[in-house]
Structures are given as structure tokens and as C-alpha cells.
Amino acid sequence: MGQKINPYGFRLGITTDWKSRWYADKQYADYVKEDVAIRRLLSTGLERAGIADVEIERTRDRVRVDIHTARPGIVIGRRGTEADRIRADLEKLTGKQVQLNILEVRNPESQAQLVAQGVAEQLSNRVAFRRAMRKAIQSAMRQPNVKGIRVQCSGRLGGAEMSRSEFYREGRVPLHTLRADIGYGLYEAKTTFGRIGVKVWIYKGDVVGGKRELAAAAPAGAERPRRERPSGTRPRRSGASGTTATGTEAGRAAASADESTAAGQPAEAAPAAEPQSTES
């Protein structure tokens, strides 16, 4: 069901790609366990870096790790000291040479994982959950590539005795459409009265033929094509109202008179209007 399943895994191979790319026969379970350890290491040690995604690719003697972050300066550190420390920890964990690539996220407001992390940080700082959710929705909807967003918080909201779930949605979020490009993020906020889970879904349009489908709507201020008229003529106006008179009986008579005069023929008089009487 599209409402329950993870949107990323539901569209795997259709609109999304694998985040771990390698092949193994007998070492498959060991590599999966190692990938989980790598992601856990990067998520626990770099909370303030704003990591949106981690991609892992393996060869026979090398492991390549791509870190997509909104704050690359925190991951790199002063003179690259933090990046060297991360690389050393990963080499100690994997036992192989590690190639570390740090990539900057251009629009963090349109990344579901970063939006969820931002809402969770506000909840940890005692910000009202409804205010944090609405602020995140407003920031995301300002982005041109975002067509819909849904933010959900679950837990002891506002310190209530009984836990509950609340969500806000703006725009379209078609969870059951396989061609829809939907980002999903999950983060937990640690508060004094327990943990609050934050989930974010962001819809960025449909993917058709490997390309994102954009709305081809014309801008509001675009000019409409004008109809050209013969040179030397002017549109006829009726009185001071500014409306063209060709649609009235007098206007049609005047237009036929002008055509007859231009052709050298006498113009026919317009028929007199018949008086209308109302019976009492």
C-alpha cells in the first residue's frame, strides 16, 4: 500500500536508484552489515552537518563513500582535519582503502531528510510543534521544484500524557503513483518528555522516461498574440464607452456604408428602428 510503505523502496528501480552499489556472493551479509555500520557512524557523529544522503559503492579493494550534506564546511573541518578523521574511521571499520567524496546540497529546503531534521531540532529546542511544522511547509513550498509536502509528528506532542499523531499537508502528495518523484525523510527529536518522530514527504513532480516532468504553465504577465489589421484603418468605437460598434445594428450598417463608398456604390440607408409598445 502506498500509504504505509517507504516511498523510496516502493519506487526502487522505477524512479529511484540503489544507494549501495556493489556485488557479492558469499560476503553479501557481511557487506550489508558493514553498510549499516557506515551509515550509523556518519549519522551519529555529524548531527550538525545536515547529511541528506549517503551513497556507498564498492570495488574489489576500495570503498567509495559519497556524503550529500547541506554544510560541507562542518564535514571537511579546518584544513580538512575532520574529513581525514572520518576517512580514518571508515578505513578502520572496513579494512580497505576509502575514497571520501563530500557533495553540497544546493536546496536543503526541498530535501525531505533535511526538512525532517530541521523540524526535530526545533522540537528539541522547545518550539511548538505546530509552528515548526507550518514553518517547514512554508519554506519548502517556496522552492520552484516542490509541488506538495506532508509533515507528520508522532509522540507526546506538547508534553501530553497520551501520545498521538498530527500532520499538515499542502499541495499534492500522490503516494500510490509509481512515477511520482517523492522524497522521504525520518528523524527523531529527543525531548524532556520522550522522543517525537518526524516524517516528511515531498513531491517534486512525475518522472517520465527518466526525466522529471515540469509544469508548462505560461507566466501570468505573458502577452497574448495580437491580431493584425490592414494599414490605414482604425477600429470603430461607439461613443465614450470604448466598445467596438461592429456588433450592433448601427455598427453593421455603418460598416456596410463604408464598404459601399469605397467600392463607388451608393450606400443603402439603414432601416428605421420599429417602435416597441408595452401593453398594460
Curated annotation (Swiss-Prot):
Keyword check for Repeat: no
Known role: Binds the lower part of the 30S subunit head. Binds mRNA in the 70S ribosome, positioning it for translation.
Quaternary data: Part of the 30S ribosomal subunit. Forms a tight complex with proteins S10 and S14.
Chain segments carrying region Disordered: 215-280
Presence of the UniProt keyword Lyase in the record: no
Any single biological process term in GO: translation
A cellular component term, taken from the record's GO annotations: cytosolic small ribosomal subunit
Protein name: Small ribosomal subunit protein uS3
Origin superkingdom: Bacteria
Alphabetized InterPro entries for the sequence: KH_dom, KH_dom-like_a/b, KH_dom_type_2, KH_sf_prok-type, Ribosomal_S3_C_sf, Ribosomal_uS3_bac-typ, Ribosomal_uS3_C
CDD domains assigned: KH-II_30S_S3
UniProt keywords, alphabetically: Ribonucleoprotein, Ribosomal protein, RNA-binding, rRNA-binding
